[in-house]
Amino acid sequence: MANYFNTLNLRQKLDQLGRCRFMDRNEFADGCNFLKGKKIVIVGCGAQGLNQGLNMRDSGLDISYALRAEAIAEKRASFTRATENGFKVGTYQELIPTADLVINLTPDKQHSKVVADVVPLMKQGSAFGYSHGFNIVEEGEQIRKDITVVMTAPKCPGTEVREEYKRGFGVPTLIAVHPENDPKGEGMAIAKAWASATGGDRAGVLESSFVAEVKSDLMGEQTILCGMLQAGSIVCYDKLVADGKDPAYASKLIQYGWETITEALKQGGITLMMDRLSNAAKIRAFELSEEIKVQLNDLYLKHMDDIISGEFSSTMMADWANGDVNLFKWREETGKTAFENSPKADGIKISEQEYFDNGVVMVAMVKAGVEMAFDAMVASGIYEESAYYESLHELPLIANTIARKRLYEMNVVISDTAEYGNYLFSHVATPILAEKLIPMLQKGDLGEPTPAAEIDNVYLRDINDAIRNHPVELIGQELRGYMTDMKRISSQG
């Protein structure tokens, strides 16, 4: 199969990359009625599969799970999750032929096999759904022309999709219809109803495209969302220990620091995050962020270029074909880092403000990383709304996974695709930061507060203006207006 994006001409590529419209709430007045009375079968019962299914069932839809015969016979985790939650479970042959909508929520690397096994069993005129378009865009999967192909992609891990729904809210969601597969013109109605059933319409829905979702999603997860947090965790921990800090304190400052810092980011963007610092620390964080951009911007652009060209996906799929040799090797190497093996911080107390005061360079990494990822996406034709959701918006959710069980938890929760891209980025970014940024750090940049200093009002004013007028802040202020009931996320120890 050929990479679908690479088969498009330039005009088509730009059109697909630029598909992005924030949908009005009244467009969801019918809720999920379009899917009521229809048989919906979910393939896969992992985090997204289970939690989307729970939400859809609670919204009044008919949900069942199709699993491989061996998964049922051996009572594997997917079978146990589905049955313990009271869902009907059957084999592909038992459930797929009567389904009106089949939703594929298996890992990316399984999609081609799932399509080969499932689509021939689907009835004429039915629909097939994804929550990530990698199989369509990067692998070039071609689905039977009588089948409608749609995507509903919540911009959160599956656990948060469920928790926000239970609160009566939801998570921001991208929806799309594959232009090659909408024979009856019902694709958008299906995607809207699916998004409503998961609660997405309560938090905001972007009408997007398979292409825009995939290219922006890959860029965000490889760079700021996972790669930058991994590289930053490793170099900051090593620096603290080298400076004589208690390893347990250093571990806690890093492990819970990302989460605490990005909670402010979630509520008020980079502006609020920077406002949590003293004036002297804010100036220093701004200066460090500009230096980080000098050091890493070329790497961000390379990742964006490799994603657009298909180089990243072809490299990763070659590793799939080789039994994930590189993925497993890199996962093992991550488990051996000093940060991952640092002592637990039992009894050590760090106040919320101390995470900011003693983590100025971490704040700088977040600021620089978000802005570089956002700018690279927009420069490649991705609209600002999509770039915001795939950079700033998801960052607190990923930081929360590190707070739970460090980098191990982050890499378990994210997809294998995200994990592979994370390693590609962090393996290059970590030595750059260690060799260029860390030697530049001064007293007060990490592990202790920034010393008081005389402040130049004009310089501070200009820095504040630069922070508040970056495009990610301008679009972020607008989009956060649709998410007026965001809960605080905290695993703080």
Swiss-Prot record:
Binding site for substrate: 415
Binding site for Mg(2+) 2: 217, 390, 394
Entry protein name: Ketol-acid reductoisomerase (NADP(+))
Active-site residues per Swiss-Prot or TrEMBL entry: 132
Domain KARI C-terminal knotted: 209-345, 346-486
Record GO terms (molecular function): ketol-acid reductoisomerase activity; magnesium ion binding
EC number(s) on file: 1.1.1.86
Name of the gene this protein is made from: ilvC
Catalytic reactions on record: (2R)-2,3-dihydroxy-3-methylbutanoate + NADP(+) = (2S)-2-acetolactate + NADPH + H(+); (2R,3R)-2,3-dihydroxy-3-methylpentanoate + NADP(+) = (S)-2-ethyl-2-hydroxy-3-oxobutanoate + NADPH + H(+)
